[in-house]
């Protein structure tokens, strides 16, 4: 009797089993899209409010998305070697961190399920089918204990 990869590398028999929907085994989601190098410039090109040249984005992403992502969500000091300059780095940082939290927490049925989850999350982010709120992009994979929510509900006294 043959076993699937998920069955042969069981981590948690009660864990989440993940099926591929958007990705193919052995093919990274980043290899499925066409990439281009662009410049992110906000404001007057002669005196920009923000500028990062040579950033890598999927061809399908707009220039507006390029400008916003480069300015707001790429991590690292602008001009430093640590500065992110590709959507691959940004999505990889976030999707990889979230998948690793699941691995460390024993959420997945197998290592293969964790890998599929990471690939599927990467694909949905890459194709802009889903998007996290800003604190996720700012902090996940960068801060040890990141703040991932943008809204806080405070108790309000009801005097009616």
Spans of model-derived segments:
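Extended catalytic cores of very large enzyme megasubunits
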Residues: 1-160
């Amino acid at each position: 009797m043959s076993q699937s990869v998920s069955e042969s590398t069981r981590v948690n028999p009660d864990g989440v089993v993940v099926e591929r929907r958007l990705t193919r085994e052995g093919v990274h989601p980043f290899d499925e899209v066409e990439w281009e190098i662009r410049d992110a410039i906000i404001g007057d090109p002669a005196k920009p409010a923000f500028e990062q040249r040579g950033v890598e984005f999927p061809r399908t992403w707009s220039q507006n998305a390029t400008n916003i992502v480069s300015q707001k969500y790429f991590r690292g000091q602008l001009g430093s070697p640590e500065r992110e300059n590709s959507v691959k780095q940004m999505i990889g940082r976030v999707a990889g961190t979230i998948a690793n939290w699941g691995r460390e927490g024993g959420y997945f049925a197998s290592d293969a399920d964790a890998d599929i989850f990471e690939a599927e999350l990467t694909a949905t982010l890459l194709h802009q089918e889903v998007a996290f709120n800003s604190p996720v992009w700012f902090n996940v994979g960068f801060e040890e204990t990141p703040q991932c929510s943008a809204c806080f509900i405070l108790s309000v006294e009801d005097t009616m």
